[in-house]
Amino acid sequence: LPPGRPASDDGGVPTATLTTGIDCCYEQHGDPADPTIVLVHGLGSQLLAWPPGFCDLLVGEGFHVLRFDNRDSGLSTCLPDGTAYTLSDMAADAVALLDHLGTADAHFVGMSLGGMIVQTVAAEHPDRCRSMVSMASNTGNSDFGRPGGEVIEAMMAEAPDDPAARTEKEVADNRLWCSTAWYDEGYIRALYAAYTERALQPSGAFERLWGAVVASGN
């Protein structure tokens, strides 16, 4: 792949009010008449996690690309403290976004938490899912395999409120779970700086998102 670059919404990224009650920030690439690929990001990420260069490659292969901010992420609705939801609710958001756009079905690609969401779409909304790719993710089955203790500890550590300190934490965390074959600290640093400039995720959002994983089980 060519070098990626973090994107900027430039104030022009649309927001859809979904039937699930979420205001969902999304971005489209390519021709909506082409088959759609929905890209679903992971915990602590935003739609910027999918580089424009990657989206451009998919468009070049004849796909319409849809990337969006999950609930409690980026510029989508940040829910009140104490709100509980599940992966099923998050999968329903993705399907409701298709409804909003008048898209009958799509290929779903998810990373980490996004991988769990697309698994749920495939299981609960099979008529809307043409195919599913779940990357760097889990099924919720404790026998399936789990990250190492150091990785789990880093994932569960609360992110600092200070944007610069939060970026440093993310750079260090990514060293734990990114492949050394392609790890690019400069890109990771720029990406997380773009996250914090665009929308700093409140700490309570992490607990709600992680709670969705725990509540959903296997």
Model-based region annotation:
Residues P2, S8-D10:
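Short, positively charged and aromatic/hydrophobic N-terminal segments
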Residues L18-P80:
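Conserved HGGG/HGGXW glycine-rich cap/lid loop of the alpha/beta-hydrolase fold
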Residues L79-A91:
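Catalytic nucleophile-loop/oxyanion-hole region of alpha/beta-hydrolase
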Residues S88-A106:
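Conserved acidic catalytic loop of the alpha/beta-hydrolase fold
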Residues F108-G110, M135:
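Short beta-strand immediately N-terminal to the catalytic nucleophile in serine-hydrolase-like folds
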Residues G110, G114, V118:
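Gly/Ala-rich beta-loop-alpha elbow adjacent to hydrolase catalytic centers
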Residues A123, R130-D161, A205:
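Flexible "cap/lid" loop of the alpha/beta hydrolase fold
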Residues G149-N218:
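Alpha/beta-hydrolase
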